[in-house]
């Protein structure tokens, strides 16, 4: 059992590494959205991501419903994060004006 747990821990570390990489792109995304006046929540993009995630999950033998639930949670968190960042940056810009 210890070897299985060690492999699960290894997978968890890899997931965190990938999440850190994704988070870096979220940081870039909100900055681009700020410059171009794009809302944090872009529903068509969310659906595009979910559809792709479900397809990939099915290809890999992972329950698509599980992956969709995880991604919706993650995307929802990132949208809230972007909304706060955008609001804070707009407020800071308005104070300077």
Which residues are covered by each model-predicted region?
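Domain-level signature for soluble enzymes in the chorismate/prephenate branch of the shikimate pathway
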Residues: 1-97
């Amino acid at each position: 059992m210890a070897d299985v747990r060690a492999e699960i821990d290894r997978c968890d570390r890899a997931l965190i590494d990938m999440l850190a990489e994704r988070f870096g792109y979220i940081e870039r995304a909100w900055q681009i959205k700020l410059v171009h006046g794009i809302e944090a929540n872009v529903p068509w993009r969310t659906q595009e991501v979910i559809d792709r995630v479900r397809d990939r999950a099915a290809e890999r033998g992972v329950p698509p419903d599980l992956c969709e639930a995880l991604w919706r949670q993650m995307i929802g968190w990132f949208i809230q994060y972007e909304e706060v960042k955008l609001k804070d940056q707009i407020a800071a810009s308005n104070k300077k004006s």
